[in-house]
Amino acid sequence: VLECVPAPLAALVSRSVSVPTIGIGAGPDCDGQVLVWQDMLGMVDGLSPKFVKHYAELGAAMRQAFQTYADEVRAGTFPATEHTYGMDEKDLEKLY
């Protein structure tokens, strides 16, 4: 794994070794590439390494979804009846 290695150096290493090289920010001449999926999808706030390409910006939508979930749990509106399994009263009484 070659991470944050200048592309010409990564190319030299890739040509010089008999094992496959995997690049993360090491240019296109490695045998394979990897990106952290949270970085790819824009889920991380703040500074991203130069080699990260955002294929989507899901971070804000995910934070909003988690906030809405937490708010509904605290307010007691989730889970509602439609999100809960019911049970016949007679079957419940058999357990006591």
Q: Which stretches of residues belong to each language-model region?
A:
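Catalytic beta/alpha-barrel core
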Residues: 1-5
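Alpha-helix-loop-beta-strand connector modules within alpha/beta enzyme cores
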Residues: 6-31
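C-terminal alpha-helical cap/extension of soluble enzyme domains
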Residues: 24-96
